[in-house]
């Protein structure tokens, strides 16, 4: 995996916004050294309104980024479109590199 244990942090998923990929109460391993946005990867992000959130970052066709929940219910979990450069105004805490949960 090529990670330094000093850069790893364990957090717990809350809610159903990332189902079916990540379930409520799953254990997540976050690599705090990987804070640059990468298309299609899942990150822990600090939101002033919501605290720490776990979402997928998707590059937009409109020169920006989308903060996306994996849950298909877009009425409850709508995409958040960030114009180019605005993604850097959010504090990316690290990339989620592993998850563990109940079978």
Map each language-model feature to its residues.
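Acidic/glycine-rich C-terminal interaction modules and beta/coil loop segments
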Residues: 3-103
């Amino acid at each position: 995996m090529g990670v330094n244990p000093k850069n790893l942090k364990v957090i717990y998923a809350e809610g159903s916004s990332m189902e079916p990929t990540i379930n409520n109460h799953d254990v997540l391993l976050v690599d705090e050294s990987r804070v640059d946005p990468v298309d299609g990867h899942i990150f822990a992000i600090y939101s002033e309104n919501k605290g720490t959130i776990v979402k997928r970052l998707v590059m937009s066709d409109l020169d920006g980024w989308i903060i996306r929940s994996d849950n298909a219910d877009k009425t409850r979990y709508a995409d958040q479109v960030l114009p180019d450069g605005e993604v850097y105004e959010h504090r990316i805490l690290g990339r989620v590199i592993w998850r563990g949960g109940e079978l």
